[in-house]
Design a protein with these regions (language model features):
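Short, flexible/disordered intra-domain loops and linkers
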Residues: 2-3, 152-167
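N-terminal pre-catalytic "stem/leader" segment of glycosyltransferase-like enzymes
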Residues: 1-38
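Membrane-proximal helix-turn-helix segments that form the acceptor-binding/catalytic region
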Residues: 52-73, 167-174
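Acidic donor-binding loop of glycosyltransferase active sites
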Residues: 196-205
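Donor nucleotide-sugar binding/catalytic pocket of nucleotide-sugar-dependent glycosyltransferases
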Residues: 71-85, 90-107
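Nucleotide-activated donor-binding/catalytic signature segment of Leloir-type glycosyltransferases, i.e.
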Residues: 160-189
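Conserved donor-binding/catalytic core segment of Leloir-type glycosyltransferases
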Residues: 111-128, 133-138, 147
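Active-site proximal beta-strand in glycosyltransferases
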Residues: 26-56, 71-75, 96-99
């Protein structure tokens, strides 16, 4: 199984909506500098989606002489751009923000008083699943239920094989809670299709 996290999904959308002729003129590297070789005959772009404090970014960004290796730095949020700017003094004239987005807006489910409240959490387990499960233990309303699609498989089989075991305890805890339904990994398309059936998306932060 190949990774299909946010980076891969957005790259798919880029290839879907931008002409091949234009894309062939660029060399796009996502997040980790050097993951894709610099092409001297193309416009080299670093599409940065990771947080500024990731260890595998420090060697490149702390060396200001290397900042000229890319023609453009694209960030997925103003918050992320500002973090990189403050931390590494990157050349602002080479930076642009293109926000994350979606291409489908499902019809929103209208909640009716008295009906069960369905919550969904579909993030990787290190993004607050432990906090969320602790919160669910404090909820004694039988009409509030949480479906958990959390897994490491979104980043591919190799990553999952090396990482999933670290979170088995959390998954088991989710399975034991009466108001939580642990489902595990489902493809992006499935999550999009199911989203209108839920009342809230919960992201503990």
């Amino acid at each position: 199984m190949q990774p299909r996290g946010a980076t891969e999904l957005q790259h798919e959308m880029l290839e879907k909506h931008v002409s091949k002729e234009l894309l062939d003129q660029t060399q796009i590297c996502t997040s980790i500098p050097g993951k894709v070789p610099i092409d001297p005959n193309k416009l080299n772009i670093l599409w940065q989606k990771n947080s500024w404090d990731q260890p595998n970014l420090q060697e490149f960004f702390t060396n200001k002489k290397r900042h000229d290796e890319y023609d453009w730095y694209v960030f997925n949020s103003h918050w992320n751009y500002e973090k990189f700017r403050y931390a590494f003094d990157i050349p602002t004239e080479k930076c642009v923000v293109i926000k994350n987005g979606i291409d489908t807006f499902p019809v929103r489910k209208i909640y009716k008083r008295g009906t069960p409240i369905k919550l969904i959490h579909h993030c990787t387990p290190w993004r607050g699943l432990n906090v969320l499960l602790r919160a669910m233990q404090e909820i004694d309303n039988p009409h509030i239920k949480l479906d958990v699609y959390s897994s490491c498989k979104v980043y591919g089989s190799e990553f999952s094989d090396n990482t999933e075991k670290d979170f088995e305890g959390l998954y088991e805890q989710a399975k034991q809670l009466p108001n939580v339904n642990y489902i595990g990994y489902k493809p992006h398309e499935y999550i999009k299709e199911m989203m209108p059936n839920y009342d809230m998306f919960v992201y503990p932060s």
